[in-house]
Amino acid sequence: MTTLRLATGATASRILGVGSFQPERIVTNDELSQKMDTTDQWIRERVGIQERRFAAPDERLVDMAVIAGSKALADCGLSPSDVDTVILANCTMPTPIPNGAAQVADRIGIKAAGAFDLNAACAGFCYALATASDLVRSGSARRVLVIGAEKLTDWVDPVDRSNAIIFADGAGAAVVGPADEPGIGPVVWGSAGDLVETIGMTDRRFIYQEGQSVFRWATTAIAPIALRALEASGLQPADIDVLIPHQANLRIIEAIAKRLRAKGAREDMVVADDIVLSGNTSSASIPMAMDHMRGAGRIKPGDVALLIGFGAGLSYAGQVVICP
């Protein structure tokens, strides 16, 4: 009988560094109100967004991913040769083939990389982070560059008030590598396929969503999933220093934080609100928020952060990480 050799991986994994990128163009609520029936007050009250970034017509998803990924490598002092795998979480590549990850790896200089795209919509970064962690711990990869990048403006009707005010463009990245102590907890993930029709694409290839249905689901289902992620890591709500949910809607974020505090999370728990100035960037929103919060001094190395992604599918994923 032939016996196969198994790879031997690291005892644990952690996030080594993070980076992000946003396009230069800032789009305010007042600018949008000139194109559709809306106002700055209406947008702020319903979704909490003040401004967002739109990519230029010639600025591609892959371009943004390359910059964010390069910044994440620089953040932890690694060179492209130190990484052997690239995962690109996204749901807005202009074509299904070729995959974006291989292009990103080549442009950054990560030669002969294992490279693949992962589509779990707004939950994509958490799915990709869990996959990267398992690759490192199984021995299938040494270090993994995980990127969430989206050019949502290519897929949004510019005069659709329900969506054009929300979605934006950008990229966020993290480098995952070996660790002596766990820095990325077990993932809790799943889906609600019976709600698949609540977010999708129109015949014109524009994003649509049943906003009220998504809001009800997110404000009731996500906090219990977050609690399960804490339990999987052996932690209590009071152990959370930072809550970084997908930046879908400020009202959803506030509802999740309120429910976690009702279960024992601290009043001084820092809650990501990057959506206010960045909009909803789908799979990019969590790593982008982490990078922005760290740069602003709102989180520090060693903080315990609860990540929770959720979106089209409907899909969700959450895990606890130690901030780099």
Specify the residue positions occupied by each region the protein language model found:
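Condensing-enzyme catalytic core mediating Claisen C-C bond formation in acyl metabolism
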Residues: 1-57, 159-220, 224-228, 310, ...
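Claisen-condensing/thiolase-fold acyl-transfer catalytic domains that form or cleave C-C bonds
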Residues: 3, 62, 66-69, 73, ...
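Buried hydrophobic positions in well-ordered alpha/beta secondary-structure cores of metabolic enzymes
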Residues: 15-17, 43, 72, 83-86, ...
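Short beta-strand segments
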Residues: 16-19, 89, 119, 144-150, ...
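Short, well-ordered amphipathic alpha-helical segments that serve as non-catalytic structural scaffolds
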Residues: 38-39, 61-76, 217-233, 286-293
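Glycine/charged-rich beta-loop-alpha catalytic/anionic-binding loops adjacent to active sites
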Residues: 49-51, 82-87, 106-119, 155-159, ...
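Short glycine-rich phosphate-binding loop at a beta-alpha junction
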Residues: 81-89, 237-246
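Flexible, glycine-rich active-site loops centered on histidine and acidic residues
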Residues: 135-168
